[in-house]
Amino acid sequence: MNLNASSVARVMLGDATLCEDDLYLGLGECVLRIRSNSPALIRELTGYFSHVAIDAKEAAMEVIAIEGDVPQTGVEFTDWKREPGKTGRKDAYAELADGRLVHKVRTGMIFLQSEEYRIAAGPCLQYNNQVINFINSQHMNWLQHRGWLICHASGLVHAGQCLGIAGFSGGGKSTLMLHMLDDDAVSYMTNDRLFVRVESGQTMACGIPKLPRINPGTIVYNPRLQGMISAEKREQLLKLAPQELWELEEKYDVHIDQVYGAGRIVAQAPISNFLILNWKRDSDDETSIEQVDLGARRDLLAALMKSPGPFYQYPDGSFQQDDASFDEDAYLRELQDVTIYEARGKIDFDKLIGLCQKTIFV
């Protein structure tokens, strides 16, 4: 079956009527328009993206989200290969003549990615986080088309300079970042997708409007976040073994402006330092940070390199493949003027924050 994006779009849109309400997002020079058949979904997305919502009439791209049953496309999907260390089925895809269809295995959601159509269809209200990720994927594509390199990292801004934070799986970069935000002099840039690019001899960092999405283990020990759950829920969680609590997968969105105050989000800034968390929960060594040469420690690149994923469409219309290898030299080139630090020893957030204040935030 040789389907094209237009024929699949007709199936996904069905007889849905798009509501009058829409949402425009101002992401630097990139403007996105979001439309849906569900006013409730537009309201939810407007609340989530409130810090980048703008009044506009024109957009570089349009994303349509159709709330309803999962459309029956009749397409046969192929599983997208997971990254090392990840298990279970997550994404599947089907190539079209001029686009790609992506199926979220756990939720059933369907997404059409092409140069003309960007459509999400299925129970969008129930799985609005996947719609949010799809919207952010369009911004990520736009950035990468303009030479920005994707990093699996958080980003904070202090004194006008970005600090990137990367870590191996379960390293606690989101927890560390949120603790650092307790300092009013620190601003939020991004949770786990940071983009870097050298401009006129200066290395710049850019984030995407994705709020931190955290597990209960991050909430229970952070007084600033404890209001996100009930006192009863916190008591139940504190009864769990530390390792069980750490591994518990329940997701909560942290609305930065509500928790930390207005004006605490920065979209773009020069980046001068990058911290890679290579510490261990079961280590007996004291927490420490050391400046390292990334070229001589290519093993650390695995913590910060990130595949663009199944939604990435190159400027020539072709798509990212799941067996594409990373270009390590591209990361070394873009980060050559950024000071790289490695955190070692046992996981101790308070100790590491103190070390960062003495070593990096000076």
PLM regions with names:
Residues 1-166, 183-189, 194-362:
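A noncatalytic interaction/capping subdomain that flanks phosphate/NTP-handling catalytic cores
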Residues 169-170:
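Walker A (P-loop) phosphate-binding loop of P-loop NTPases
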Residues 173:
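Conserved lysine of the Walker
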Residues 176-177:
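Post-Walker A alpha-helix
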Residues 180:
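Aromatic pocket-lining residues of Rossmann-like dinucleotide-binding sites
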